[in-house]
């Protein structure tokens, strides 16, 4: 395996070091190439993602990212220049976000909710394509538009990915949208789900409006298995999914080119947390679970299962506080 590693900013290098420690135990001999992309490079050279780096990234089987963002750089500069550009250049049309409440982890929900579902979010369309504009700016008559772009091609490939996930899990898929108001895009999403769903007769299909889905994710999260949704609704609902299952500190994600043409990128959901960087206070669990997602994506399900089991064992036994390295050592020993 050839792995591109982008430690990034803040706590990124610390959590990635522990994730790689675990990876080296379950899959020895991975060929790694580290890229110094992030705030330091931006300040030193003015570069965020040089054109010369993209062809190099494409030569790898996968990309592992730590965290991006630094208070010394204006908000959004690094995120747009690195994360969004990578997503579009490498056609990461699937954003995969598992949500699982591990034993030993407290949920803000009452009782012991059954939480084990995944959200499949479309990643390259919707209102995030930069289509729109503004006129009469800074006048009383200013008008701004933000256009949501939805294509049959873009929707179908994400829907197919979601159905395949559902087929391999508990065979239940929920489309989340707002078809009663967003009638044009909603109709296209619903028809695509209906047509692709006919090819997966074992998968039960349901629909929920986005507002209803947020309610049920809090009151009855066990009803969900695989959720498929668009870019904007997915952006919102995935953070809620992380919150009910213990917080973004435990949330892993995959930005995936389901065609396999380009390497997919895996990362913890949490930010760079510059206030605790360098203090070994960061929890590397989300980065380690991102390695599990990476291995699952590449077909090494056995190694991924070993990581998941080791993480579950560690979380169930945790008490008090532990350093970043201590947590990484414990999970590496448990795999």
Swiss-Prot record:
InterPro entries per UniProt: ICDH/IPMDH, IsoCit/isopropylmalate_DH_CS, IsoPropMal-DH-like_dom, LeuB_actb
Query: What residues correspond to the site Important for catalysis?
Result: 128, 178
Q: Is this entry keyworded Cell cycle?
A: no
UniProt keyword Membrane present: no
- Assembly with partners or alone: Homodimer.
Q: Where does NAD(+) bind?
A: 271-283
Q: Which NCBIfam families match?
A: PRK03437.1 (NF002898)
Biological source species = Nocardia farcinica (strain IFM 10152)
Where does it mainly reside? cytoplasm
| Name of the protein in its database record | 3-isopropylmalate dehydrogenase
Q: What GO cellular-component annotations does this UniProt entry give?
A: cytoplasm
What does the record's cofactor remark say about binding? Binds 1 Mg(2+) or Mn(2+) ion per subunit.
| Residues bound to substrate | 87, 97, 121, 211
**Cofactor(s) needed:** Mg(2+); Mn(2+)
- Family classification: Belongs to the isocitrate and isopropylmalate dehydrogenases family. LeuB type 2 subfamily.
Q: Which residues bind Mg(2+)?
A: 211, 235, 239
The encoding gene is leuB
Localization (cell): Cytoplasm
Alphabetical UniProt keywords: Amino-acid biosynthesis, Branched-chain amino acid biosynthesis, Cytoplasm, Leucine biosynthesis, Magnesium, Manganese, Metal-binding, NAD, Oxidoreductase
The enzyme's main class, written as a single word, is oxidoreductase
What HAMAP family is this protein classified in? Answer: LeuB_type2
Any one of the GO BP annotations: L-leucine biosynthetic process
> What Enzyme Commission number does this protein have?
1.1.1.85
Q: What does this protein do?
A: Catalyzes the oxidation of 3-carboxy-2-hydroxy-4-methylpentanoate (3-isopropylmalate) to 3-carboxy-4-methyl-2-oxopentanoate. The product decarboxylates to 4-methyl-2 oxopentanoate.
């Amino acid at each position: 395996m050839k792995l591109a590693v982008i430690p990034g900013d803040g706590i990124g290098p610390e959590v990635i070091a522990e994730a790689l420690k675990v990876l080296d135990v379950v899959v020895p001999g991975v060929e790694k190439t580290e890229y110094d992309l992030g705030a330091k490079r931006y300040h030193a050279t003015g570069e965020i993602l040089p054109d010369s780096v993209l062809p190099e990234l494409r030569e790898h089987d996968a990309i592992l990212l730590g965290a991006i963002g630094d208070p010394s750089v204006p908000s959004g500069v690094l995120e747009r220049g690195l994360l969004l550009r990578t997503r579009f250049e490498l056609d990461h049309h699937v954003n995969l976000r598992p949500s699982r409440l591990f034993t030993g982890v407290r949920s803000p929900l009452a009782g012991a909710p059954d939480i084990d579902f995944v959200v499949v979010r479309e990643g390259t369309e919707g209102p995030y394509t930069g289509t729109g504009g503004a006129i009469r700016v800074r006048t009383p008559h200013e008008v701004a538009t933000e256009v949501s772009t939805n294509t049959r091609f873009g929707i179908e490939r994400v829907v197919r990915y979601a159905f395949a996930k559902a087929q391999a899990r508990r065979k239940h898929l929920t489309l989340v949208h707002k078809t009663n108001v967003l009638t044009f895009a909603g109709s296209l999403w619903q028809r695509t789900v209906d047509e692709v769903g006919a090819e997966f007769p074992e998968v039960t299909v349901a629909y929920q409006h986005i507002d209803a889905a947020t309610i049920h994710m809090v009151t009855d999260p066990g009803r969900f298995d695989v959720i498929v949704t668009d870019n904007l609704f997915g952006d919102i609902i995935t953070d809620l999914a992380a919150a009910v299952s213990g917080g973004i500190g435990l949330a892993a994600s995959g930005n995936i080119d389901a065609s396999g043409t380009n390497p997919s990128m895996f990362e913890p959901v949490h930010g760079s947390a510059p206030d605790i960087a360098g203090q070994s206070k960061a929890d590397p669990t989300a980065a380690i679970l991102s390695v599990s997602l990476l291995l699952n994506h590449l077909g090494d399900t056995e190694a991924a299962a070993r990581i998941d089991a080791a993480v579950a064992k560690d979380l169930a036994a945790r008490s008090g506080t532990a350093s970043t390295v201590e947590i990484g050592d414990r999970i590496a020993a448990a795999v």
